[in-house]
Amino acid sequence: MAQQTPLYEQHTLCGARMVDFHGWMMPLHYGSQIDEHHAVRTDAGMFDVSHMTIVDLRGSRTREFLRYLLANDVAKLTKSGKALYSGMLNASGGVIDDLIVYYFTEDFFRLVVNSATREKDLSWITQHAEPFGIEITVRDDLSMIAVQGPNAQAKAATLFNDAQRQAVEGMKPFFGVQVGDLFIATTGYTGEAGYEIALPNEKAADFWRALVEAGVKPCGLGARDTLRLEAGMNLYGQEMDETISPLAANMGWTIAWEPTDRDFIGREALEVQREHGTEKLVGLVMTEKGVLRNELPVRFTDAQGNQHEGIITSGTFSPTLGYSIALARVPEGIGETAIVQIRNREMPVKVTKPVFVRNGKAVA
């Protein structure tokens, strides 16, 4: 039996089509995925992300533990509320999960991890936290709503009290602050500005209804996927998993190689991969009729005349751009064009950086 978030009833009242998403009943859309997508790009939309897992870590050695656990370095986090995106790797350098870590005090950090990887993440974190004496609290008492779009912050702020409005005023991206019942973070998964707001489960439904009244459009998993793909953001299980190096998933920027004496899980394997080279993640654009889909082969000939094949990890029709886009994992040596096999047709595609839309504007 799939689990329900505290907002399940609100979704059905809003006319959602519900689907089982990694063991959670979640809204796929509320009538039109395209309308929901455009609302986020042009105005304000919101997503129930209560299926994600919030994990609080406490203890005097929490920073030391996270410097060992994560490929990115929490030593960068010196201002309370600052957040960091990182991979959590296994010993062979594969990605167990990608997550966000928030720093509050020297003995209090917070992780937000994916729902599909919840059990293995908690097991891995618990196993490695033990020698450091870390107290782990899974915050199943909290729901989370992501409010995203150019007008999202202004519309959400109409629900805040004076202290909350003051706390978020001028807050830069990748910060979070707890004021009263609300944990408000300037993070998201759409390529737009916005907030991800965690609040007690019993307050979530009222807050959702108030956002609807403030003109924020409910959005489902369908729009969430097309938005994150346009923004070039990875989805766990597609762009990366435990067999894929972050270097092959456009996550090289999340690896803190310095200082060289920091020993983090997976470092040794990553150094070998960096030396020998890995595949890489690229963007693909197809303006011809048709849609690029996951797992389609991508073929190209390198400068030496050698033929290579990669694979599409995520593909869709881009509502913002009006043509098909994809992320693909390919061998080194790809040029500016490639061929994608769609059924019995060989379709030409343009190779780009793995990002297509930022703040509503085309970049591909």
Curated annotation (Swiss-Prot):
InterPro entries in the record: GCS_T (IPR006223), GCS_T_bac (IPR022903), GCST_C (IPR013977), GCV_T_N (IPR006222), GcvT/YgfZ/DmdA (IPR028896), GcvT/YgfZ_C (IPR029043), TrmE/GcvT_dom1 (IPR027266)
Top-level enzyme category: transferase
Keywords: Aminotransferase, Transferase
GO cellular component: cytosol; glycine cleavage complex
Gene3D superfamilies: Aminomethyltransferase beta-barrel domains, Aminomethyltransferase fragment, Probable tRNA modification gtpase trme, domain 1
EC number of the protein: 2.1.2.10
Claim: Lyase is one of the keywords in the record: no
Record GO terms (molecular function): aminomethyltransferase activity; transaminase activity
One Gene Ontology biological process: glycine decarboxylation via glycine cleavage system
Catalytic activity: N(6)-[(R)-S(8)-aminomethyldihydrolipoyl]-L-lysyl-[protein] + (6S)-5,6,7,8-tetrahydrofolate = N(6)-[(R)-dihydrolipoyl]-L-lysyl-[protein] + (6R)-5,10-methylene-5,6,7,8-tetrahydrofolate + NH4(+)
Annotated family: Belongs to the GcvT family.
Functional summary from the UniProt entry: The glycine cleavage system catalyzes the degradation of glycine.
Assembly with partners or alone: The glycine cleavage system is composed of four proteins: P, T, L and H.
Entry-linked PANTHER family: AMINOMETHYLTRANSFERASE, AMINOMETHYLTRANSFERASE, MITOCHONDRIAL
Protein name as annotated: Aminomethyltransferase
Native species: Shigella flexneri
